[in-house]
Regions:
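Sec-dependent N-terminal signal peptides
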Residues: 4-14
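Long, low-complexity, intrinsically disordered polar/charged segments
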Residues: 9-11, 67, 77, 81, ...
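Sec/Tat signal peptide C-region and signal peptidase I cleavage site
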Residues: 14-21
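A broad, low-specificity signal marking well-ordered, structured residues that form hydrophobic/aromatic
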Residues: 18, 36, 45, 93, ...
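Central antiparallel beta-sheet cores of small beta-barrel/beta-sandwich binding domains
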Residues: 22-85
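Short, exposed beta-strand-loop hairpins at the edges of beta-sheets
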Residues: 85-108
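Short, solvent-exposed mixed-charge patches
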Residues: 111-112
């Protein structure tokens, strides 16, 4: 009986770990007020606008773990792609886009 309980507990913990999502996954309110969804896509995370003028457009791909991510971010209005990064802290996501890693612009998104 005890062995069955221990085995069931171990299986539950392993299942929870396997299904744990990275902190970046979810819906975020952008600085412009649009909703962006960040979801797993292959070995990275895709950033797609869910609402607003550019709804449905993929605007980024980031890779990383544990709250720090790097990749590419696209400004849909200018149709330009930049080196990007994201850092999750609680319900905030600090997104940054850089040109040649010298000229950078950042904004904070809020988890919905």
């Amino acid at each position: 009986m005890i062995r069955s309980f221990v085995l069931a507990s171990i299986i539950a913990v392993i299942a929870a770990i396997a299904h744990a999502e990275e902190p970046i996954v979810g819906n975020w309110k952008t600085a412009a007020g649009d909703t962006a969804v960040i979801a797993s896509c292959g070995g990275s995370y895709c950033v797609t606008l869910k609402t607003g003028k550019y709804a449905g457009r993929k605007i980024g791909t980031l890779a990383g773990t544990g709250g720090s991510y790097a990749g590419e971010i696209t400004d849909p209005a200018a149709e330009k792609t930049y080196s990007g990064a994201g850092k999750v802290s609680g319900n905030s996501l600090r997104m940054q886009g850089c040109v040649m890693k010298v000229l950078c612009k950042s904004q904070t998104w809020t988890r919905l």
